[in-house]
Amino acid sequence: MTTGQGDAVSTALITGASSGIGESLARCFARAGHCLVLVARSSEKLKALALALAGEYGVRAVALPADLSQPGAVPALAARLRRRHLTIDVLVNNAGVLAHGPFVEMTAQHQQQMIDLNVSGLTAMLSQFVPGMVARGRGRILNVASIAAFQPVPSLATYAATKAYVLSLSESLAEELRGSGVTVTVLCPGITATPMLSSAVEASAALARLPDFLIGDVDAVAAEGFQACMDGEVIRVPGALNQAATLAGRATPKWLLRRIVGAIGRTTI
């Protein structure tokens, strides 16, 4: 069992692993023979998933519940890994939170929660684990962003801004680490059938009317992210429709793009 970088058995740490894209990514890595460290806030779901994956694929799967939005959570997680003599070869930063609605109607607490997890937590994980990968001369990083990273999204203003940060940081880090043996991939999915989407639909009747062809299959999205990570691809946008939308957005003048996305946001988000 290898990661394709010459090491015998690799360990993949996946945040936000208890459901959605994170859970599907955990299955992808387990299927490929990687040992797993699963991180999320939901202790019971995490432990059940670890047991299921260990039984199904015969890999070691460790559940380490943690809230990465909290100060000190990342160093504490690293200390727990050291006590278990676990070295992380693949880091998957998938944990994230979404809150939608007009900016002025959202509480400062909701805004800060997105920044604390989507930006600060992810950055802390990179700062904690990337130096060791570079020192060892091998490693893979998969950061999960969104197609919202490519354009302003009124009604998802802060969320889109956090994902733009993830995209920019990932691209910059990929170039910084080129030639080091450590690769950086950023996965930018569109709307995907996850518990996060289900929660958003409950809060927005308009979202419930989205046609099925606009909603990506979570396992297919995860499979694309896994393969892109293994291939060392820098940016992966799953799905032809999302790829076309991203290209169209980049070719559209910014002022017009803001108007278009704003109009869509006012009617569907």
Please describe what each predicted stretch is.
Residues 18-19:
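Conserved glycine-rich cofactor-binding loop
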Residues 32-49:
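Conserved glycine-rich Rossmann-like NAD(P)H-binding loop of the short-chain dehydrogenase/reductase
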Residues 43-44, 65-76, 108:
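The beta1-alpha1 cofactor-binding region of Rossmann-like NAD(H)/NADP(H)-dependent oxidoreductases
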Residues 102-103, 110-115:
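Substrate-binding pocket helix/loop in short-chain dehydrogenase/reductase
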Residues 126, 162:
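Active-site helix of classical SDR
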Residues 146:
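Residue(s) in the substrate-gating loop at a strand-loop-helix junction
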Residues 186, 208-245:
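C-terminal helical subdomain
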